[in-house]
C-alpha cells in the first residue's frame, strides 16, 4: 500500500528542479478495466428493433467502487461528457455469477435493470506457459433515457455483453505487478 503524508522530511531534487511528485494512482479490482463493448447493442425503445440499426461502443471503461462493485456510464454516454454523473451505472458481482445493476440517478434518467450475469474463464497461454488469460464477460440488459432537456429525452435499451481480457504473469507474486496492463 502507498501512503502519502505531508512532512518536512521531503527534500527537493534541485538538480532536476522538480518540486512536486505527480502520481496517477489507479485503483483496481477483479472486474475493473477496459471492456470491449462492440457486442453491446443500444436500441431506441420507441422504435421496433428490426426497423433500426443498433448503436455500439468500441470500449467501455469500468472503474472501481469496492471489491465486488464497479461503475461505468450507460449506453453510448461519452466518458468525457460534462453531466456524465447522471448516467453512472453500478454493477455488483455476486459469487454465483449474478450481476445486478443500479443507478444513483435512476429516477432522473428512468433507469430500469432487466437482467444480468457474468462468467469468468481462464486459460494458460499456448506459447508463454507463465501467462494466464482471464476473460470476464458481462451479459446485461437495461433501459435508460438520455436527457435532452428537462422534459425531452430519448429512450434507450442496452442489450448484450461487455468482455475484458486480463493477462496475468503467474511468476510474479504481487497481484498488482503481475497484471500486464
Task: Report residues per predicted region.
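Intrinsically disordered, low-complexity regulatory regions in eukaryotic proteins
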Residues: 3-181
Amino acid at each position: 500500500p502507498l501512503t502519502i503524508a505531508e512532512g518536512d522530511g521531503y527534500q527537493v531534487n534541485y538538480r532536476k528542479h522538480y518540486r512536486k511528485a505527480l502520481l496517477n494512482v489507479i485503483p483496481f479490482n477483479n472486474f475493473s478495466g477496459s471492456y470491449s463493448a462492440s457486442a453491446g447493442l443500444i436500441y431506441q425503445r420507441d422504435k421496433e428493433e428490426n426497423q433500426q440499426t443498433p448503436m455500439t461502443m468500441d470500449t467501455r471503461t469500468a472503474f472501481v467502487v469496492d471489491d465486488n462493485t464497479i461503475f461505468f456510464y450507460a449506453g453510448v454516454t461519452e466518458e468525457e461528457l460534462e453531466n456524465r454523473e447522471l448516467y453512472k451505472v453500478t454493477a455488483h458481482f455476486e459469487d454465483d455469477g449474478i450481476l445486478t445493476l443500479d443507478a444513483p440517478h435512476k429516477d432522473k434518467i428512468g433507469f430500469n435493470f432487466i437482467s444480468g450475469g457474468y462468467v469468468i474463464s481462464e486459460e494458460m497461454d499456448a506459447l508463454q506457459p507463465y501467462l494466464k488469460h482471464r476473460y470476464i464477460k458481462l451479459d446485461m440488459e437495461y433501459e435508460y433515457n438520455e436527457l435532452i432537456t428537462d422534459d425531452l429525452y430519448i429512450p434507450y435499451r442496452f442489450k448484450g455483453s461487455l468482455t475484458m481480457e486480463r493477462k496475468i504473469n503467474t511468476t510474479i507474486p504481487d497481484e498488482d505487478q503481475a497484471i500486464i496492463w
